[in-house]
Every structure is written in structure tokens, then in C-alpha cells.
Amino acid sequence: MSSIHSKVVIGEKRREMSSTAAGGSLPASIMANGSGKPIKMEMKPIVGTTAAGKGHGGLLPGSGDKHESWQMELLMERLRNKAKSSQYKSFQEMSKAVRMSLLEKRYALDAVEKSNLQKTLDSMQYCIKVTSRQGLVERLDCLTRQLGLKLSEDTSGLFISSDMFYLEIILDPNGTVQDVKVHHECKMKQQSCSELVSCLQRGDFVDFTTQLEGLASIYQLNAEKKIKVNAFVALQALETDLYNLYTLSTQHYNDIHSLLLKSPLGVVQKRRGGHAMKLTYYIAPYDLLDLEARKMKPLNTELISAEKIGYSVAVNLEASTANKLQIQPLLVQQGNSPVYSPIEKHNSTSLPATFVLRLNKPMALNVAMLKQIKHITGDSSAVTIDPATSNTCLMSLIVQHASNGTVNNIAKGLFVTLPDQYHCYYMTENKNLQGTIISSIPFTEPQHVSKILVFLRQQALFNQLLTSCIRNNGSSSTRMSDYEHLVVFEVAALSCQYITVSLEHPFEESIAMVEFDLRNILAIQVRVFCNGYESDERISKQVSLIVQRTMSIPVTLRGLMKIWQEDYEVKFKGQGNGGGNGTVDEGNFSLSMGPDEGGGNGPAGPGGGGGGGSAMNGQHNGSLNGSGMEFCDVKKVKLEPMDQSKKRRGVEDFCRSPKSSKVESEGGNEAMDEEDDDDEYDESTNLSSGDSNSLGENQQTNAGQSSSSTAAMGAPAPVSTVGPRNSVSGNASESSGNSSILGSLDFSSLDPDLMRSSNSSDLDDTTEVSEPEVKVKSEEPSYATSVSITPIGVGKSTSSLTNSVLNNIGLDKRPGIEIIPLANAGTNVPSSITITPIPMGSSGGSLKSSSDNSGDKKLSSSSSGSIHRKSGSSSSSSESDRAKLEKKKKRRHEEQLAQLQQMGPPHKILSKSTDGPASPSGSSRKFSVSPVPLKSGSGSSSSQIFLSSGSPGSGSKSSPKHSPVHHSSPKHQGSYGTSSPKHISGGSSGGGKPSMSALKSATSSGSPSSKNGSSGIGGSGKEEGSSGSGSKSSGSGGSSSSRDRDRDRDRDRGEKRSGYSSSSSSSSPKLKTPAVKLKQLDLTNCGSTVSAGVQLELMNSNSSGGSSSGSGSIDLTDSALFGIGATDLSKNASAAAASAAGMLLLQQAMKRKGSLSAVIDKLKSAQGGDESSLMLLPELAQQAGFSLKDASTPGKTASSSLPVASSSSASSSTSSTSVSNLTGASLGSASAAAAAALAAHFSSAAAAMQGKTSEYMVKPSSDGIKLTIQNKKGSKSGSSSSSTSSSSSKSSSSKSGTKPSISSGSLPPKKLPSSQSFSGAYPPTSGSSSSSSGKSFSSGSSSSSSSKAPFQKSSSSGSLSSSGSSMRPSSKSSTSSSGSSKDKSRSSSKSSSSSSAAAAAASSLMATNAAMAAAAQAAVNANALNVMKMLGLTSSIQNMEGFVKTLDTKFQIPKLSARSGGSSGSGPGGSDIEKLKQESRPLSSSSAPTTPLSNVGQSPTGSNDFSLPFNKLPGDVSPLHSTLLPNVMQKMFSGHDTSMLMRRSPNLDHQSSSNSRDGFSSIYGKGSTTPTTPTGSVPPPFPSPGNVQSHAMDFSNSSDSADASLMRPPSRPSSTMSNHSSSDKLIDATTNSNSMDGLRSTSPAQALAAAAVAAQLMNKLDNTQQFVAALKNHHHHLSALSLSNAAAVAASQLAAAAASASSGGSAGPGPVTSPTSVSVHIMKSPVPSPLPLHGGGGAASSSSVGGPDEDETLVGVSGK
């Protein structure tokens, strides 16, 4: 209690104190102080008052002024007294007093303050719910006051009045509105308005206000009251006429849609109270979406009236100058047609007003339309225009307006996310389409309205379609994971009635164009163009229905791609018919190879062009069933009834084609297990009997038989009915004279179903080529595929994988390698792939001769010989294989000699086509430029895909035609850069004959060096000789010994995967030739070579000297890498082959070694100087299009040479160890970079292991430059390699007779300009050279192995960073083809180093010191753009002849020393190599593996066909590439429809091949032949960022525009059309197609390499996003392949090293500094790299259309 009490006391005291302080005792204290007397207070005294008062008395007054204290105290006292006397008043009284005092107007109120006060009161009023009459009156009073009207209250109701009208509102006693009547001055009586009644009854005062405004606006005229009276009269007269017209139109247009879109006025709503008449003329489906129900609301007039949807105009009257306006209705109905009476005095009056159509929302209108509208209305008054938007580009204006200003730069991509697709749209501005924003349109007569609405409706439709590409959900655009699945589109408008959308065909390596014809708004027509031809009517109808239902471009394009996908799946299920019409112009890419042993010199027939048809072997008169068959699944193709010979051909596998049989019999192919043959025969028979009697399948399975049987018979067996297949596998081999390669293929291990699917597409691609090729080849020995890769333990489950793989490979099946993906384990289980080397009798010699034959020979001789040996021979006994190989060699040699005799003038077209079939580019495979190339795979990477050394073999064969020499030769230049027939036949295994020297070299050494020689020969006789000599002496010499050893090893290890080192070497030369000819072609040549072109030649450390036994070499690149491999491999090559074979090999290697890191460790240890060098060219390297070869020449060149060119000139072009030659050029550059890195890593290790003399030998090969780096200590290698590089390029250019740039590959000089870097024939601008250098780089590298000059050009292109500077010297060096092999080596080395800037980066890994020099050079061009170029971004474009042309001839390849790191590393043994291969392969696969598009896969034809590269790309290649590629392709290859890519239709393939000449597949069948240069080179064709895209990765050229528009698709649809149409006419287009193919194939691979290298090299996401995406794809692929972290790390390290090298940074990781002996075959990569994605700048654009929910709903409505 005490405590409580104390608390209370304290509380009391506190209160007392506070009250005192507050003044409770203040008055008393003040008074006390003031008066000196204590004052009595009425308040109860407070304890401590005195003290408090005294204490505070002096302080509180403040200053202590007594006077102030007195005043306050007196006042307080007065108040107290007053309150006391008056007693306290009530609150009401007080409040009233306050109010009265406030109302006293003592001060004048400020007008502003008064208005603000009124606004505040009004705002408060709006928040008060009207529940009584008084509340209603107050609210209406507030509204009317704001509108300037008067409100008066009467007993009966309320009146709202103005000077011209008044409203009477009748209320009941409760305040409920009963009626509202409107009375206008001009009217005699009031009119009841139900609209106003309803809005007041429901308390909608906002609407009531709007109606009052509408009524008041009628009279807002500057005139007297008596004049203004007529305003409402005139407006009513107009409304009467309009409604009468609408009533008439409803009789003619029964349904709401036609009424809305076709009737004169649309849907008309009469005036409702104060609401003006509304005309709705267009409604977008987006406005009808019911997001909750996920459906579309039914369109009807009630919905239009109830909801404010669509585009509409209100009919109003507004003040203006004086006009004569009607005061009476003018519409008179005469019959069924309305007639307007003229305006006269009696029916009109003059008013200072005009009628106006006020748009419900501002609209962007075309200025041309606005002028027409003004013309209609007589321009009585200016249309209301937003001055800020006057005369700006219409599309930009639409995008800005639709995005609410969030998107200001349409150069950035506009990202749209659909339920299952991710799109990026680039708007290509048309300067002729100027626009402005309008909000109203004045008019004076009723007939004007319908005419004005025609334009507004057209504009609304146009705006709606473009607006459908704009979204608010742009945040997702920045997610890199989306880039993998991103599909890029370019939207352009020729006028407001035509919108064109360009995209990359997902399945046909081409650009597709979708044209929206908006003239008939009710029935929009969509036309789809693929490969220059309009798609069938069915597709157009389906797409038209979708766009009519959705009015959305993204949803429509999604439906189109779904249709393509369905067709593609049906095709590969054998349900579809491949309808290819092979024409001589389109398909005649198979040049007569010269009379084969058993055949005459018939003119090359059109048979080569269509993959679907079968070409007659001996007669060259094979007619292709389909010109576009390359992209068609052969299984889908229904072959015409065949005569007996045709049937026989159909039954026999291409591997068993007569040529193959011959070669086999000669080469001992007869020794092939009969069981295998029988099995194969049965399989082939079954296949052929099946719906898919695709040449590919039948040929593959039957080819082995036929080749065996024919060989036994000694007479050329008719090519299997599957011409393309035969040409790819059998014919390619045959043309190579390696038909035995095909025969040697072990088809027994192949799954017939897989074969069927894979072959079908290959057949399609190769049928045309193969048959003509087969004719020639049949006479020549045909080589069975050396390698058969069959997934083991896979049931039918492989079908899906097979389909994908086959799709990729189908275009480009190579006889050399059969990779059959196991359903589920394509890449999982290394063991699931059996790689059986099949000994090829005359691997070297045959390869040579076959290289003379169009790409087929090239393929079969090197790739086919070695690869086929591998594949088929593995099952056969070693002795049989050896015997066969020897026989094949002899036959090849004979064939080559025959070819030389037959050489004659070069076939320009054939040259390209040659490349096409064998090389990755689509044209070769499409056309039987080289009857053999498709078979042999030299032209079509598929045949070369065979893991065995066959790839080199085929490379050799195709090499002559494709070899830099060929390309270099003026002839070759004349014809699409491969004008010389040698070029054509050799490089493409087409009609060109190898030079005698080449033949001699091929003949002299069956070893790889011989093959190299042959490939060198391919370009031109003397150049071949030179090249061959150069190759022999510098690279070929080593290569020869390697080749011999390889051969021996192949024989010994026939069952092993290793192919002949010689074969790989040879294939690389061949690849070179194609690569040189066209980078794409190079890829094709490498096709087999390129795809498989990277031959992992296991240079056994056991092997003496530089040429460790070459038998270890595995030519996986061609078909495996590019999916161009023969039969299955070719299809799978791009995805399955690369991923499966590479993956399996890599996995095997990993399993054997435990991991890639283990292999690398071994390699590193090998770097220590281990004598044994395992030149393991990872799949990446193969993809990059180089074969790993151990050159035995210790002094001259590195013991191991990587014929990068062999794998794919285009890929090589990517200039890394061309590991990335996966997709020809497309994957090639990225892949090459990665591969180069890997290869460099391995190579450095291998070099260290070998401890061979440190020398770099560069051999120009037809495909590119072959770098042989022999580095005892690693320091030496740098200088050596650089010297070799320059030497190689010199020799190459000199020999070919063409400028180095021309020699740089299949690309004709014209195309070469873009890849000027090839031989340096074309002086490149710094930027262009850099860009072209990316492509050149590959070619240069491959040329080092095969052809000297071509690849050197390519090499220059290849060296991304140093390509510009390097190229110059390289090309110069190329010119001296006759230089000693050392010189050649130097030239090659220079070219190679320059061209392989990326490779250099990889090389730098291998040889840090050597790489440093190259890196320094590379650093010059090391900027992001250069890096991209080096990576092959530019290569891809450069692959096209046009691009090649633009390349700087003088471009110098960085010294090999810098690049040597990029070359492959050597490993302890063949198994290691295989392991590395597998590892590398997965890596390369990874580089572009994520792209499932078959378009990524290399086409069988090779790099020529733009569409082919995608087909060739590994199936795993990320869609990003394809997505990006479409833009690039659009720009680069306007002719190549994406649809081509998408469907790989035979026509497309064929066309693209022929069109490729321009560097663009011709979409329209005739396109300007202007090559699309990367950027600088071919700016005219593709001035838009598209150029950059076409160089997708060519950052150097595109750096300026790359940042802003790298991702942009080409902006010249018209140019594309012209290019396409022009290309179609050109058979040379094959080369271009090849180049395009190469580009395609390169882009994924190069994207990989670029991704790896560029990711680190480039800081600009805009430029590097594509790389990043590619890199991501690569990593995905790696993880998918279950690559160990070590492998990934190794890959990344390699990439980093490559990046540093290319950037001119440190040479590379110390561990990889110096390979003992590295042979880098750098091939030109024609394939364009994927477009770099912009940072998603456009993604943020907001769209008026709406978000994902709306898109998803609309997708559901679209019906697709």
C-alpha cells in the first residue's frame, strides 16, 4: 500500500508541476511579479504555486518585459470575467459563431484558391454515394457546373440546360429517376432518352458526364445561336445516311465477320443519348480471348456493343472553317445499290464545322494512305496528326506505339514466348513506309466514310499483325537458357498489304520466307517459300487458316513450324513421298570424273542434282526423282519403277555400287565377310523394297554388295538405285575410286531400320549426285565405307535418335562411315558404337583418283577409303582389308589417272556440286557434282563420316576439286570458285580431274600423303600436283608415311576404329579442296571429310617419326560430325554421328582413360616428349574438318598432321583444330574452336609426348591448310608452324593458279571474296578479312593438309583474331605453290595460323610459345568480331562463294605456332585417340549439339547448300544456331528458305546447292548470284545486320553492326529472292550451296568453338550471345553425353586457351604449350555461324497484344 500511495503522491506532484509549468498558475505568478501583490485566483490554489510562480515568473514572459506580462495578464483576466458573466455557451452556439466569423468577407477570395476549393469539394462529392434525392441533386449540380451547364430544380424534377439544349430529369418522391428527356433548340418536341435514364438509375455518373459532354460538343461552334441550331440537324442527317447504308450492307453481308471486315461501314451503332454513332471496322482475335475459359468469345453485334473492343471511329461534328454540310439525308436506294444525292442549297447549309471520324485510340497510319484519305476528303481540313510522329518510319512507329514507348529501337529483337517456342523478331524498316499517328479524320460527305474506312481497316490489320510480335513480358528475353531454343525471325513489309517473315527452316538447311498477303482482309493468304520455291498448297492453306483465326504472326509461325515438323516426321517414317525434281541446272553438280576404269566420259547428268533420284553410273544420265531430295527423307521418296539395272542399283547398297565393287574386288573388298555382304544386301533389299527405297539405304546396304560383286565381276556395277546414297557412300567412294570403301563398310552391324531412315535422307541428298558419280565411279574402283558405326544394344528405340541423326545426316550420308545411333544410347555408351576400320586397297591412290571424280572420289579415296575401310573392314580380316585396300589403291590410282585424262576444262558448277555431295554443303550432296562424293562422302560429309581413315580418303578425293588448288586455279575461280573440272570433280569428286601430280602423289603414296596429294590434285592438275607435292613434302610426306602406317594399322586394326592415317590425311586434303572451293563445299568435301574430316589419326607413338602409324586415325568428322556421313552416319552425323560417334568415342576414351581429363593428362605427359604421339583429333577436331595426322617427316613437318581440311574445309575454316567441323561451316567454326582447343590441348600433349623435332609444316590442301606441328621442345614448333602455315598458303595459291582466296576451297572466286582470307586472292578489308578469315581459317587449315592455297585462304579466314593481317601473307604465300614443301608448310602454317585464329587459340593451348606468336598476330584481329570470324562465324558466310570472294586474298594466317595449340594433340595410342575422339566428339557435338534441327546437320552435298549445314550439324546442335542462322541465312542466303532447313526437302537441298553459288540458297529459284559476304565483303547483298548474321559469328566484320543488330535477320528479303532465283539457275550454286551448307554446318560447330572461345574472348553479349548460346549448347551436349567434368573443364580450358590465343593473349595454358607433333588441317568453313543474340533489348518491349496467357489461349484457338 505504501508503495501505491507513494506512486499516487508522485503522480499528483507531477500533475501539479506540469499544470504549473503549462500555465495553470502562470497568471497568478505573472500578476504577482507584475503588481507585487498576490492575486486571488478563482482556480483552486495549487501546491507550490508560489514557488512555481516565482521560479517561472521571470522566465516565462520571455524577455522579462513587464509591459508584455501586463498585457497578457489583463487579457486573460478579461476572458475569465466574460466567461463568468455569460456562462458557458453550447457547442452549437460556438460553432455557429465561428462559422459566421468565417463568412465575414473581410478579404477578397483568390480565384485560384476558390477553384481549388471547388475541386476539392467536387472530389469529395464523387466519393459520396448517392442514396437520396438531395444527394442526387448535389451530385448533378457538381457535374453540370464542371461542364459549364446549369442545374435548376423544380418540383417535378431537375433541369440541366445550356443555350442550345436542355435535359429534363423526372424524379419520383424518393429521388428515383423516372425519365430523362432531351430537347434541342432545333427540335419542336422533347425526346425521351433511355440511355440517360439507365445510366442515372444505375448511378453511373461517369457515363452520364460523358453523354452530357457529347451533347454539348455538338454545339461547340464559333457562331450565332441561330446558326448553331443547324449543327445537330446536319449531324442527324449524316447519321441517318450512314445507318441506312449499314442497313443495306447487312443484307449483303450475312455473317458478322464479313460485315465487320468487308462491309462499307463495318458494324454500326446508332447514336445513344450523348454517345455518338460508332463504326467498328476491325476486331483482333486478341480482343475476343476469354483467358479464364481459354477460348475465344463468339463475335456478335451484342458483344461489340457491350464491350469496347476492336478498332472503331465515332461520327462527330467539330468546329472548323465554313463547309457546306447536309441538313437532309442524301442516300437514295436504287435497287440494291445506294446512291448519294449531290449537296445542293436545298439539302445543305453552311456551317463553321466539319464532320469528323474520331478514332477510339490513336493509330499509326501510313503517310501514303493518309495522302489518299486527304485526296478523298478534298483535304478540307488537316487530319489530326501528332507532330512528334510525323514522317517517321511506320514499323518503328507501330512498335513504339504498341509498346507504349518502351521499345524505341526496332533493331533490337522483340522476344515472344509461346507455350512451346521462344521467338525473337527483328523488324526490318522500309524507308518507303513512313508513318504518323492520327486521332481523327475530318470529312464533309457521307460517301467519304466508307472510303476512309477501307484504309483504316487495312492499316489496322497491318498494325495488328506487327503488334502481335510485341510483348510486355520482355524480362524472359535475358534468360540465356532461352537462347538455345530461340527461333529468330525477320519481319519486313514491302507495303501495308504485304508482310514477309524470314526464318531458318528447322529441317531444311535453308531460309524460308512466309509472305502474308493482306489485300483480302477477310481471307488473308499466306505463301511459304522454301529454297526459292513456293511450298505446296496444303501448307499455305493450313497457315492461312491459322493466321485468319489468330491474326498473330508468332502463333502462325509456330503453326508453320509444327506443320514442318509433322511433315519431317512423316517423311522419316517413310510415309511421305520425296518429290525432288532434279534438273540438270539444279542437280548437275556431279561432274564427269573422267572415264572411270570401266566407264565412258558421259556428260554429267542432272542426276547429281536430286538426292531422290537415282543416277546412272556409267551413263551420267541418271534423272533424279527429286531435285530437292537432299533434304528429303529418302524413305519418304517413292522411287519410280526401275528398269532392271535401276532395280539392281536400288537393291545394292551405295557401298556396294559397281565402283565400290570394283574397288573392293581390286582392293580385296571381296574379302569382306560374305555374311556381311549378304546381310547388307538383305538389309538393303528390304530397305529398297520398303517405302523408303531410298537410294541411301539401299545403296548403303547394297552398295557394299554391289561394290563387292561388281568388283568381283570386274565390271562397274550399276549404282544402286539410290543414287544419292550411292553417290554419298558408294558413288562417293566410287568416284574416289574407293567404292571399295563403301564395300568395305560393315553394313551387317548396321541396323537396317536405322540405315533405312538415315540412308533415305542421304539418298535423297546423294541420289542425284551418286548416280552420275556412280557411273563414273563404277568404272573406277569403289571403296566400301571404311567405318561402320552401329549403335549396339539399341532396339528400335534408336528410331527417334536415328531419325534425328538421319535427318542431320540424311542429306549427307557418307559411304565411309556408317553411324547408326542406338535408340537411347547414341551418345551414352561408347561401346554402343562399333567402329570397324575396313582396309582399303588403294587408299591413297584410289583416293586420289576418286578425288578427281567429283566429291565422291575425293571422299572415297581418302575418307571413303580410310573410313570405309574402318567401317566395313573392321569386320573383315586384317589381311582381307589390306588386300582390299591395296586393290583400292591401285584402282584409285587408275581412276585418278583416268580422271586426269578426262579432266578437261573445269566444270564450274560441278566444282561446287562436287563439293556439295561430298562436302557438307548441301549442293554437293544434292547434286551429283561428284557422282562419288555423296557416296564417298568427300562431297557429302556423311560418307566421310565413317570414323575410319576413310574420311581422309574421301577428303583426298574431293580434295582435288575442293582442294585449295582447285579453288585457287583460275578455272575454279571461274566456276564458283571451283571452276576447274578438277576442282569440281576432285574437290567435289565431281567432273574435275586431279592433276597428274596429284594423281602421282596419290598413286605414289597410298599413304595419307598420297591422298593428300590427290586432294591437292583435285583443285587443278598442276595445283594438285603442287599441292600434293607440297603436302607430301611438307605435310603429305609425313602424311604419306602416316598414311602408310595408318593403312597398315587399319589393316592391322581393321576391326578397330582407327582408320588409315593416310586416309585421314587424304581426306583432309580432299576436304581441303571442297573447303577451299567453297567453305561450305569444303565442309561437304570434308563432308565425309569435313564431317568426318577431322580424322583422328592415331599416330602411334610406336609409329616411327612423325608418322606414328596412321592406322590409328579415325575419320569421324565427316559423316559423324556433320551428319553427312554415308548412310546412317550422314544423317546422324550432324547430331547422332557427331554426338553419338564423337560422344561414344569420347565416352569410350573417358571410360578407358577414366575421363577426358585423364586423356588430357596423358596428352600433357605426352607433351613431355613421349615418342609415341597419339594424334587424337577429337570429334571436335574432326568436325572442325581437320584430320589428325602424324606426319612422319620429322624434319620437315610435325610428325602428326591434323588434316583439318579433311574433316571439313568449312569447319576447318573455323580455324581451331577444326574440332568443330561438326556442321561443316556452321558448326565448324564454333566446333572448330572448341575442337581446336581440345585438339590443341591433345596435340600439345601429344607433341610433348612425341618429342619429335619441333617443326611446323603447313600443307595447303584443297580443303584448307594442313598444319603439321612438330615441336620437340614446344618453342620450335611455334616458329615452324607459322612458317609452314605461310608456306602452305603460298603453295596452295600458286598451284591452283587461282588466287589463294579462290584456292581456299570449293568456293569459287566469286564466293571467295567473302572469304578473301582463303588464299589472299581477294584483298580483304581488315574487317572483312577478319570475317572471311574465320571461314578461310578453316579452309586454310585444311588446305595445309590437302590443298595448299584454298585452305590458306580459308586459313586466313579461319584465324578469327589475326585473320586480317595473317590472311595477306597467307594468300601471298599461297601464290607460291611450287615452293618447297617447307615453304608450303610455312605458307600453310601461316595461312593455317591466320585462318585458325580460333584454332590458334586452341593451338596456343598446345603450344603456348608457338601460340603466342600466332596469338600476337591473332591479337591484331582479336576483337570480338574477329574472334567470331575466327571461330568461323564469318566462315559460315564466307563459305559461300560470294563470301569467299570478299575475303582478303592477302590475308595472312597467324603463324602456326600460335595455332598449333589448336591442332590436335597426340595421345599414347590409338585407343586414346579414339577416346579423345569420343571425348572430343561429344565436345564438338556439344558445341552445337543442342540444336535438334536437322538443318544443323551438314547436308550430304556439303557446304554448298546453305540448308545443308544445318542438316549436317549435329542433331544436338542447339536450336539457337538454327534460330539464329535463319537470320543469318536470310541475310546471307536469302534464297535458302528456313523451310528448307526445316524440312530438308529434296528440292530445297538441291536448290540450295545450286543456289549456294551465291552464298545464298536461292529461295526463289533465281536469285542474284551476289555472294553474301560476311559483312564487309558482301555488304551490298546484305547491308543489314543480316550480313553480320550471315557471318553470325563474324564479329570482326560485323562488330559495328553486331552490337546493335547481330541478331538481326537480314533485312533484304528482295535480295534474298533475287539471290535465290539466280542461284537456282547456276549449277555452280552447288558450290555455294555447299558453302552455305558449310556455313550451316559451321555455325553450330563454330558456334561451339566460338561459344567457347568467344565466350571468353568477347565481352559484348550482343556479339557473343550467340556464342554463349552455342557454348551452352555445347555444355548441354556434354552433360547429355555424360562427359566427365574433366572433359568439360578441358573443353573450357581449351576454349579459354583458344580465346586467349585468338585475342592475342597468352599463348595458352602452359601444359599445352608445345605438342611434339601436331598436324592441324584447317579447312574453310562456309557455314554461317549462328546469329549472335542481342541482349534482349527488344525483349523488354511491351506489347499491346498481351502476355503468355493470351498467347497460350490464342495458340489453342489457332488449331495447331
UniProtKB/Swiss-Prot annotation:
Primary location group: nucleus
InterPro entries with a match to the protein in the record: Mediator_complex_subunit_1, Mediator_Med1
Region Disordered: start-end pairs: 1-24, 575-624, 643-785, 827-1078, 1188-1218, 1269-1401, 1455-1510, 1540-1640, 1701-1760
Biased composition annotated in UniProt, kind: Gly residues: 596-615
Compositionally biased region (Acidic residues): 671-683, 762-771
Ranges of Polar residues composition bias in the record: 684-711, 911-927, 1495-1506, 1548-1559, 1629-1640
UniProt-listed Pfam families: Med1
GO molecular function: transcription coregulator activity
GO CC, alphabetical: mediator complex
Bias (Basic residues) ranges: 959-970
Compositionally skewed regions (Basic and acidic residues) per UniProt: 643-665, 1042-1058
PANTHER family xref list: MEDIATOR OF RNA POLYMERASE II TRANSCRIPTION SUBUNIT 1
Similarity comment: Belongs to the Mediator complex subunit 1 family.
Subunit structure: Component of the Mediator complex.
Protein name: Mediator of RNA polymerase II transcription subunit 1
Species of origin: Aedes aegypti (Yellowfever mosquito)
